[in-house]
Amino acid sequence: MKVKSIILACSLLATMSASAQTSKGIDLANMNTAAKPGNDFYEYAIGGWRKAHPLDAEHARNGSFTDLDEMNQKRILALIEEYSSKPQPKGTLGQKIGSLYNLAMDSVRRNREGAEPLKPLLKKINDIADRREYQLVTAQLDARGLDCLMFGAGVGADMKDAANNLVGIGQGGLGLGERDYYLSDDAQVVAVRKAYAEYLKKMLVLAGNDEATAQRKADATMRIETRIAKASKGQVELRDVQANYHKMTYNALVKDFPGIDWGNFFLAQGFPPFSHIDVGQLEPIHEVEKILAEESLDDLKAYAESHAVSSAAGYLDDNFRAVEFELGKVMSGVQQDRPRWKRATALVSGVLGEAIGKLYVERYFPESSKQQMLQLVRNLQKALSQRIDEATWMSPATKAQAQDKLANFIVKVGYPDTWKDYTNLHVDEQLSLFENMQNIRAFLSQDYISRKVNKPVDKAEWQMTPQTVNAYYNPTTNEICFPAAILQPPFFDPNVDEAVNYGGIGGVIGHEMSHGFDDQGSQFDKYGNQNDWWTAEDKKNFEARTKVLVDYFSSIEALPGKKINGKLTLGENIGDNGGLNISFRALQNVLKENPALNKSIDGFTPEQRFFLSWATVWAGNARPEFIDRQIKTDPHSPAEARVNAALPQIDAWYKAFNVKKSDKLFVPQKKRAQIW
């Protein structure tokens, strides 16, 4: 089952990854002081780092994030190897961790097995006799981890009744994920589309098809996916919260979408009976109905087989992995695959996330860091409260609602209070890696359904594991969450001065808080319900101010001739804008209360160190292919823009570095967004 949240949480980065600092927090070697701050602050702050850290063959991007991610992978590997290096009692967590890692590392066995573990399931697809059986079999396979469906399904908080979960379905079924990869004539997109078609054909050949048959099936798959893409919404349209919510009764679903056998689908997926459902996007589901009725049975089976093989490829032999990597090279520009131990570590950490997380925090996360972080959060809440009070564009009524929502933030730091139970998850080394992953995904899917369908939302549940280098805000629970792994340099260091921590983790805290009041989060109240708590005039003022960010970021080139999508990145840009303003205000509060801290270090004032710290967080290099994909699919702006575009919107930055009207990054006051 492809898990579909009703409303996605807003994270700091799509994939996060940061660098060690000196005890002072700002490493002067990272800088290029020959650059002028007002012309290119990114180069000024971390030009030295970028020059000293060219991209290696393995990475599509590097940076302070990647350094921290690399360190974390080694830490997780050390934890895993304590169990994988020697036999463990059967059924224990140690056995599950060690056995799964060893299976993932055993390429000799997988190369010997080839595609054989997959063959019985491909036979099930090829033996399908009619369209009704097709829907049943693909639902059954999907429930065991083979993503054969043309739509997504899952469970999440009902955004109109956030205390309770709601079953949801929505658009899906695209191997490339994003509709524009099928429809755009952009040169890089055309190259990706061509590579994907070749990928499908090669995968099907490895699965046992001859060249001609594989070509026919790949062509059928591409045609069906293109049909789905044409009916699907783009990334910007998906950000419209209200336009992607269509709650109805189960009976209405059956009546309005009769071309899909919903009874057998939900039965095969393991869902108990339920009364209501959210159909996030209507047109793509109607198009799936048409596809199921109009395409030949052979072409439908070709689509299912292509997606089944693609889902299984990562658990089969090295030839499958090589084909996967070839597609990845075109999409991201990466030149060398990750070593097997990294892939195996990521697999174990993904499957047994909280088991690894518990080991991780016991070994690497001191309780003192959690307490210091909680104090920082309180300081940031105070700063945001002050800025709300001082806002001249909001009425007292809306301010009161905003303050109430802020006061009711749920704050999660480090790790969950209770850990997931993996007792009924089994790993059997007598079975292949693929067979084990089928069983594991079936367990995880059924566990997920049993905990959520017809149940209230568990607000204690975490959406990220402690070892994840990221953070998030969830509007339907009104929570901000900071996993243990992000509470390390350059984000957070208990041994550096306040300015550096406020520019790092303070900016992150403020970023996530701001998501509670961005273009999406502002539509939810303190209880997590989608509820308009704004006056009409205040909403108009808010939208006018956010449009400043849309227009500004839309004018910025991320690559020659290719600009950032200001509408797609609006929420994250509001997060950065608000995060910087809020954290800077919190720093000013600290300096006012502790005048002794208001001193220069290495010739930099606290205000300057604050902004240098923010830039250090986003240090990095990236391949053009990676940036190209990012600006098409990612709601986060590229790293350079999160410095050179974000900071010119912050008044305090101009004063800190004496930025003049003649400087290249200068933005006139009337074109700066003044929001949170």
Segments predicted by a language model, with ranges:
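Bacterial Sec-dependent N-terminal signal peptides
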Residues: 1-21
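Short secondary-structure subsegments characteristic of cysteine-rich extracellular domains
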Residues: 58-80, 212-231, 501-507, 603, ...
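Intrinsically disordered, low-complexity linker/terminal regions across diverse proteins
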Residues: 69, 256-259, 278-282, 338, ...
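Active-site-surrounding "flap" and adjacent substrate/cofactor-binding loops of secreted or lumenal enzymes
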Residues: 35-39, 44-111
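Noncatalytic, helix-rich "gating/capping" subdomain that lines the substrate-entry/channel surface
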Residues: 83-375, 379
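Short, solvent-exposed loop/turn and secondary-structure capping segments
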Residues: 28, 52-56, 152-154, 178-180, ...
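Hydrophobic/aromatic-rich, well-ordered segments within soluble, folded domains that form packed cores
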Residues: 30-51, 182, 186-206, 396, ...
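Short, Gly/Pro- and small/polar-rich lid/capping loops
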Residues: 21-29
